[in-house]
């Protein structure tokens, strides 16, 4: 029991030291990511109404790549002034349909039949 507690304390102390004396570029990079995420959230809060924001957060749990595409689309529309009012849930559904159509993958099935030597023609009776 004492060994486990000692090991936990060592890990905690090591984590503190790494955080304190860690790579300064890493901390700056994390700060930049944090600021970017904060900026995205503030723009989306201005552009989306409450129900659309809830739908987008639910979608983020299931399909994060599609959510990122929709967020980028909304931010781009907001920057270019193409949104005259807040996007409702129905508007978000329409945008989701557009993004789905653009990223839709078509699957094709290709049959590769084996060519078998037919020995019926060569039968000598």
Curated annotation (Swiss-Prot):
The modification Phosphoserine is found at residues 51, 119. The keyword Transport does not apply. Widely expressed. Highest levels in heart, testis, kidney, pituitary gland, adrenal gland and placenta. Pfam families: dsDNA_bind. The modification N6-acetyllysine is found at residue 63. The modification N-acetylalanine is found at residue 2. May function in the process of apoptosis. This is Programmed cell death protein 5. It comes from Homo sapiens (Human). The gene is PDCD5.
């Amino acid at each position: 029991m004492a060994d486990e507690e000692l090991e936990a304390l060592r890990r905690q102390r090591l984590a503190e030291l790494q955080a304190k004396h860690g790579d300064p570029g890493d901390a700056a990079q994390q700060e930049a990511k944090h600021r970017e995420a904060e900026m995205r959230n503030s723009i989306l809060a201005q552009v989306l109404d409450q129900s659309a924001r809830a739908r987008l957060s639910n979608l983020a749990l299931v399909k994060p790549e599609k959510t990122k595409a929709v967020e980028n689309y909304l931010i781009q529309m907001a920057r270019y002034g193409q949104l005259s009012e807040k996007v409702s849930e129905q508007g978000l559904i329409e945008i989701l349909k557009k993004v789905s159509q653009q990223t839709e993958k078509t699957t094709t099935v290709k049959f590769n039949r084996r060519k078998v030597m037919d020995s019926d023609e060569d039968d000598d009776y």
